[in-house]
Amino acid sequence: MTTITRARDFFAPKLRHVAQFTTRQGIAVAGNLVYGLLCVRILPVADYAKFAVLFAYMGSLTVLLDVGISSTLGPLVGEQIDNLPLVANYVASLRRLALWVYLGVSPLAAICFVLLVQKQHWGAAVVAQMLLVLLVTAWFARVSSSYGAVLILRRDRAYYYRVQIIGSLGSLGLLLVFWLLHSVNIYVGILLNVAQDISMAFGYFRRSQHLLGVKGEPSAQQERAILHLAMPNVPSSIFYATQGQLMLILITIFGHSASSVANIGALFRLNQILMFFSQMNPILVHPFFARMQEARVRRNYVLVVSIVGILVMVYAGLAFLYPWLFLWILGPKYNSLSFEVSLVILSSAIQYVAGLLWMINSARRFTYWWNNLSQIILTLLLEGIVVWKVDLSTVRNVLYLNIAGATLTLLINLGVGIYGFIVGPQKLESPIGPDDLGMASPEEHAAG
């Protein structure tokens, strides 16, 4: 076999997976990325501060309302995916649990939101409107999670991604129409996003009804099974739900003006550039290392992490040398953030490598009971010390904390990898694979 033939056989399937990602999930992710960046450029700073806080809080609330419940459908059904009444009953049980979680969490979340934004002096009417949007959208996001899990379970990924693409490109197209008509304001930016979430929820609901063909009945026994499987992940779900938006929450609490909030919100939109590429890790990196012969793992582990590390550091270096490239993306309202934009790109580069390490470690079953525990304890300790000792009213100090947290995550994941090579992987006790669970790093779940 010639070198060219070997190279073709190696790269052809991977390029095919990249093409599938680009034409499916990648389009939806890119559409949402462009939508968010356009809102940064178009909306006034004061309005974008509201936009950023609302959707950051919504992202955390969506994770808190799920706490891993929807991801239990695959493991509980197992190989009985053709037993449609069983699947329908589990979905009905999921929905009833979701209702109880929503009724329990949403009032507390509403109170916390009011306390969070009270320093911004946005007025009772504005905060009430934001709460309405928050609670309505969070509910439909839960509907999407429950019924979207049915499409994944029944391997109807084409329709699953089609709903996302239509919603993403539809909202982006309408935003462009309003922009051409010079009619974009904060209400347009928010309501188009809400419409996207609602359309996705209805799309998944209708498709799941078609796939199942039967109406399920909830049962206490199935609800107990769901909770039994989901409860061990609740602490980490809560932790990552708050961590994903922590920097914006901190600047909202400690910042002196809405411009500081808008600056952090705009800067963190740039994080999503690398997040777009991290979506390919479950498609390319995870199966590549999961199927690799043990003798080849160590060399390829070092090689892949080194190459990716060099590439993302070059990317971060561009931000320090040519910050105007990224400032142009944000628009002229943020031209004063040349050093801050370099810091946020550096943190996103570190987070990308940390996520890559997590993905490889998961593929090789380098997962241990102390892994998440040490991540949570050390991160909370770091953040507690910084909140106590550092003035977090400035954008720059908040970004320094973000870099420190990303570096800590990187070091922990690197330590887990080294430990895995020394001690060995966890013993496989379950036939459930990553495709059944929708493998993604905790950082990606939180940001998503």
Where are these regions (language model features)?
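Interhelical loop/hinge segments that connect adjacent transmembrane helices in multipass membrane
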Residues: 1-14, 158, 162, 186-193, ...
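Transmembrane helical elements of multi-pass membrane transporters/channels
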Residues: 16-36, 164-171, 188-208, 220-286, ...
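Membrane-water interface segments that mark the loop-to-transmembrane alpha-helix transition
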Residues: 17-29, 54, 63-117, 129, ...
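Small-residue hotspots at the loop-to-helix junctions and early N-terminal turns
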Residues: 48-56, 131, 258-269, 338-342
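Helix-loop junctions and terminal segments of transmembrane helices
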Residues: 66-82, 152-153, 212, 271-295, ...
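Interfacial segments at transmembrane-helix termini and the short loops linking adjacent helices
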Residues: 115-133, 258, 321-349, 396
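Hydrophobic alpha-helical transmembrane segments
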Residues: 128-133, 161-210, 374-381, 393-420
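Membrane-interface junctions at transmembrane-helix termini in multi-pass inner-membrane proteins
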Residues: 139-163, 290-291, 346-373
